[in-house]
Amino acid sequence: MTDVADTLPEPLPDLPAGRFSGRETFQQLVRDAFATAARDGWHEIVISDAHFHDWPLGERVVVESLQAWARSGRRFIMLACSYDDVIRRHARFVRWRGTWDHIITCRRSPAANPLDMPSALWSPQWVMHRLDPERCVGVTGSEPDRRVLLRESLNEWVRGKSTPGFPSTTLGL
């Protein structure tokens, strides 16, 4: 006989605040953030990175969280220098992106220096900002000042330093 408590998923921890270091820690923060977004019903998510090559976007658990999160009225903004690594490494995410095109805005800035592009996940509730993407060192938190400053930086990139990119379908002749 199995105990019902043994079959229930682990409750999500509150998202942390403070410094983080290491690729595995970073990737787990991304997984936890998307799971929390689905659980808590975040209305908007913005992700930004030069290439997203080390983000766990193609993992089943991430796409399942995004699927649970996605619905009408939600907004997902994605900013990158190039989406080549996303297409090559994250097939599940690319399929999810095609399904939910109506709530997703993708922007690209191919001429930008990849080191200048913010590597971040922003929501109205919590943010994660990799200050050194190579070493996976960054900060997280829900403080209003941190959220506002990061959003202003991301808005500058979205509005003034990028163009539409990563279409959900490619039409051929």
Predicted regions and their residues:
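PLD/PLD-like phosphodiesterase catalytic module centered on the HKD motif
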Residues: 1-46, 50-173
